């Protein structure tokens, strides 16, 4: 997971002020530091066939309410259906109310999540901008 976190942080650095430490390592995002301690966080390594393809962290907010805390698909697996399949599998694994958030700078993530959630819910979702882009739906 730590290696995937570094790839995630590298990818995310295009949109944020994430900086490398003097030894060339990105500092851990808060949810990554907490994944082994917080019982409300569920961590997944996404796979395409047998190869690691990314990661997901789901946070339980309340009984049957969830937030997609982190979601990352390696570049070589983007636009292959791997991310869509992983997102749908997570929605099925955790039925209930969901929120999925993206930072305003990450237009590709916004497009991905709108497309995936629209298809999964048949358009039955709400989107707000405060300042993050947030899709909310129940499945």
What are these regions (language model features)?
Residues 6-32:
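Conserved GNAT-fold acetyl-CoA-binding loop/helix
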Residues 30-45:
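A short helix-loop-beta-strand connector motif used in the catalytic cores of GNAT acetyltransferases and
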Residues 43-45, 51-60, 67, 72:
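Conserved beta-strand in the GNAT
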Residues 47, 71-79, 103-104:
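A short, internal acetyl-CoA/4′-phosphopantetheine-binding micro-motif in the GNAT/acyltransferase core
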Residues 73, 79-93:
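Conserved acetyl-CoA-binding loop-helix of GNAT-fold acetyltransferases
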Residues 99-114, 118, 126-130, 137-138:
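Conserved beta-strand-loop-alpha-helix junction that forms the acyl-donor binding cleft
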């Amino acid at each position: 997971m730590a290696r995937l976190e570094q790839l995630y942080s590298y990818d995310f650095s295009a949109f944020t002020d994430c900086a490398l430490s003097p030894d060339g390592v990105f500092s851990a995002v808060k949810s990554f530091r907490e994944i082994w301690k917080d019982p409300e966080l569920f961590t997944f390594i996404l796979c395409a066939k047998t190869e690691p393809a990314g990661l997901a962290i789901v946070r339980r907010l309340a009984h049957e309410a969830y937030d997609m805390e982190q979601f990352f698909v390696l570049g070589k697996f983007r636009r292959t259906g791997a991310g869509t399949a992983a997102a749908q599998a997570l929605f099925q694994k955790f039925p209930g109310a969901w929120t999925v958030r993206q930072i305003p700078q990450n237009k590709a993530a916004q497009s991905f999540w709108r497309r995936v959630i629209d298809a999964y819910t048949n358009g039955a979702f709400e989107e707000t901008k405060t300042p993050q882009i947030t899709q909310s739906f129940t499945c």
